[in-house]
Amino acid sequence: MRFSKQLLFLPCVALFIVFSREGKAQTENHLAGPVKWMTFEEAVEKSKTEKRKIFIDVYTGWCGWCKVMDKNTFPDPEIARLLNENFYPVKFDAEQEADIVFRGTTFKFIPQGGRGYHQLAAALLNNQLSYPNFVFLDEEFRIIPIYQGYSSLPGYKKPEEFHPFLSFVAGNFYQKANIQDYQKEYKSPYSASSTPGNN
């Protein structure tokens, strides 16, 4: 009887190892490509010596549209250039379990049902946990609102749809205009027919 329990236990261990490796490979795939991704902690630390805005891609391992962004949008040369030259680009797993200490507050993972969420993700997204979601922080770690009343930019975006938002923040246009007015004057590096503001 004891031997049969051990035999049942071995396949469970093997499955756990396979899924753990798959999850690790998936995380490493998020960090591959032309964008120089870093952790939230690394971006905050780097900001202490060289001030720069922070772009945060809030994702989860189960989010299909997050994977499409990783495959189609972030590898785009124009998107990667804007991110690398103007921001500290951060990948933040909204379900990561490690604590993060930021400005004297410890943000923790909150188990909920079969999954859970990280308190930092909830704070960044104003408790609107949908993925993918994108947050911009200024050089003093304040959230830069893209739309009036919204702290984040939710949803999948193609490169030509995403570029105006990145250039809006990178060029500090958010300090003097709203995104709707900016898009009317925005000059796209993509074809005019597929870009908001150039139709």
Describe each region flagged by the PLM.
Residues 50-64, 89:
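Short active-site neighborhood of thiol/selenol oxidoreductases, capturing the structured segment around
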Residues 77-80, 84-151, 159, 164, ...:
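Thioredoxin-like thiol-disulfide oxidoreductase module
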Residues 67-71:
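Detector for the c-type heme attachment site
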Residues 1-9:
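Bacterial N-terminal signal peptides that target proteins for export
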Residues 10-18:
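Bacterial N-terminal signal peptides
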Residues 19-25:
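Sec/Tat signal peptide C-region and signal peptidase I cleavage site
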Residues 36-53:
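A short beta-strand-turn-helix
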Residues 26-32, 138, 144-199:
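Non-globular targeting/processing and membrane-anchoring segments
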